[in-house]
């Protein structure tokens, strides 16, 4: 090494004079890139999570709605079947009650006619036997006495029905028939929904075949006249 180099005056070196702009900018650029990439990645993941939540919530809402609609549809179907089944029973009951009410009215007419005929016979007997035929009070007392001795009511009333109506009649009308002393009987020859009432020596046949025969006889009798 030469003496000139050693003898050369040393220049003062200051570390602050180093130009670090390029490195700092480069480093800052890298850090900014990393932050941006992280931010983009976080946003994408957040969007995916939101999308998954939307799908999940949509699926749950759809499942609940479908379950509710399915339940309502099933309930409506079951209720319609129940209503249809019970409507058939109600229709049978209404038909039975209508026929029974009509038959009882006819039966009452027969009983009333029988009572009137009995009253006429009693009146005739009283008029023939009493010495006081013109005494109204005596006449009424004798009729009252005779009426007290004889009970004008249904004697052992019986209702004959088809075996097909056995369960229906027993279930809905068994108690009331039993309460009023009616006996329910079954006959295979009686069509379903029709019946025969008997009491003492009075019989009321409300079957369609009997009504048809009576109608034919009535028409035949009118044609003969």
Curated annotation (Swiss-Prot):
Asked if the Swiss-Prot or TrEMBL record annotates the protein with the keyword Transcription, the reply is no
Keyword annotations from UniProtKB, A to Z: Bacterial flagellum biogenesis, Bacterial flagellum protein export, Cytoplasm, Protein transport, Transport
GO terms (molecular function) for this protein are: cytoskeletal motor activity
**Example of a GO cellular component annotation carried by this entry:** bacterial-type flagellum
Q: Which residues cross the membrane?
A: none
* Chief location bin: cytoplasm
Family membership, please give it.
Belongs to the FliH family.
Q: Briefly, what is this protein's role?
A: Needed for flagellar regrowth and assembly.
UniProt name for this protein: Flagellar assembly protein FliH
Q: Which organism is it from?
A: Buchnera aphidicola subsp. Baizongia pistaciae (strain Bp)
């Amino acid at each position: 090494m030469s003496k000139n180099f050693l003898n050369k005056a040393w220049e003062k070196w200051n570390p602050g004079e180093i130009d670090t702009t390029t490195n700092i900018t480069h480093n800052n650029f890298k850090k900014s890139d990393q932050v941006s990439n992280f931010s983009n990645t976080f946003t994408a993941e957040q969007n995916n999570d939101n999308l998954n939540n939307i799908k999940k919530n949509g699926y749950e809402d759809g499942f609940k709605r479908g379950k509710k609609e399915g339940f309502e549809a099933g309930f409506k179907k079951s209720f319609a079947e129940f209503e249809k089944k019970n409507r058939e029973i109600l229709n049978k009951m209404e038909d039975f009650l209508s026929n029974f009410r009509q038959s009882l009215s006819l039966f009452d007419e027969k009983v009333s006619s029988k009572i009137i005929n009995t009253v006429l016979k009693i009146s005739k007997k009283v008029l023939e036997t009493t010495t006081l035929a013109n005494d109204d009070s005596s006449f009424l007392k004798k009729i009252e006495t005779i009426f007290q001795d004889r009970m004008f009511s249904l004697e052992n009333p019986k209702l004959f029905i088809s075996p097909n109506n056995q369960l229906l009649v027993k279930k809905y009308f068994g108690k009331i028939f039993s309460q009023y002393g009616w006996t329910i009987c079954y006959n295979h020859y009686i069509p379903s929904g029709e019946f025969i009432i008997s009491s003492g020596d009075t019989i009321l046949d409300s079957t369609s075949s009997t009504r048809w025969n009576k109608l034919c006889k009535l028409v035949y009798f009118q044609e003969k006249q």
